[in-house]
Amino acid sequence: MRPDERQPFKERWLGRYIAYDIESFFVAITEVSTVAGYLAGCLDNPAHNPRFADNGYYASFAPLCDPYPCHLHINLDERYRNRGIGSALIAAFAAQAASAGRSGIHVVTGERARNVRFYEKNEFRPLATARWNGADVVFMGRSLRPRRRSVISTERT
């Protein structure tokens, strides 16, 4: 990333979350007090929130934002990837969203981005794609509703 791109990037992916959703901002700190990564989350539906109007893909994904209203941006220092830290950050945000009564969480990422596999591992499912800024993006949702389990009786009468 070029130096002139850093400030707009920070504002887009961090600034508005810190300013309005600090209670949904999670930081992973290592045993030597180094920041390993963060998750910036929002419990509100971005399709109905003017703060996220610059993310034009929400026009395409608006119907999906109702069952999956909470959204997040996550970033880990590559030295700390593949250690379960990102999954722990997502679990913390999912627990917060569930306790707030929300039905689901989502992310939007590049359709062929390497993080798609990470999200799938964390129970997100690809639900729709759209073209945005010359790239294909995918809306991935994770339900926070309790799963129904089938109960099969093995008793004989």
Pin down the residues of each PLM region.
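Short hydrophobic/aromatic beta-strand element in the GNAT-like acyltransferase core
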Residues: 23-27, 38, 73, 137-139
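Glycine-rich acetyl-CoA-binding "A-motif" of GNAT/NAT acetyltransferases
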Residues: 31-37, 114
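Conserved acyl-donor/pantetheine-binding loop and adjacent beta-alpha core of acyl/acetyltransferases
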Residues: 40-74
